[in-house]
């Protein structure tokens, strides 16, 4: 009466209308059965008495699945390697003896990671444009040939020695886009009281950081001084600018992999061991982190199963994930998930197709 059985030779069968059909894998069998049943061993004598049907199943469905955890994973990352990883026999960075290469894109499930924090950033190149990556996300920098572009880069701490990470646009999109940088149409006065820096306009004053004051001075703002009492007598007035508030230490390839975290902010991940080269067409080159089995994923726009080898399979609904036994094991934004190669959709209609 078991919906899924395994022969003494290891062949899986799934019951369809009282007929046992050979099936490619447990994922296909569970989808057909509509429940997260475990395969029960069936003896040869019982198998010989059973009605047998044609082989069915989805050939590229995940071979093994992780049971649903109490709390979904929420710390996936999409990364770029900045340099070739040195080969080591004790701690290879991928299976099969192949090493992670410079500029490879790697998607990782729950890696050890650190946010860029308030003091670190990354400079990236993508499709002829430079971007600043911070712990909050990404913002485009003004063109390098413009006055604003030169002023912003100098104040941020960008120079000829700063490493620019070359990002494909799909990986760039995994970082949350921040409001664009902008200077006031008419530069305000930059006032130094000795205790702080202020932007003064006819409407009033707004506080500045030293980095912002340097940028405004670089585009022609007049610099002057005043006493704290003179500033205190002026009204607060919003200033139409959006400029970085501080300079940064910029990431180099020696610092680790530069990554987009689950929430879209910048992060750093140490070079990871055991990543696997991805098969099929995808932006990502490698994947790692699901050694316990494939997981059900909620992308916020739909459901998928990601296999231990990094293939993503579309799933119709949460009920299918429950039937697979994974439930929602991870919450991963589509911007990261889409970097992986797409496998066959996991649904009952596809699973019931007779294989040739």
Residue ranges and their predicted role:
Residues 1-356:
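Short, surface-exposed polybasic-aromatic patches that bind anionic ligands, especially phosphate groups
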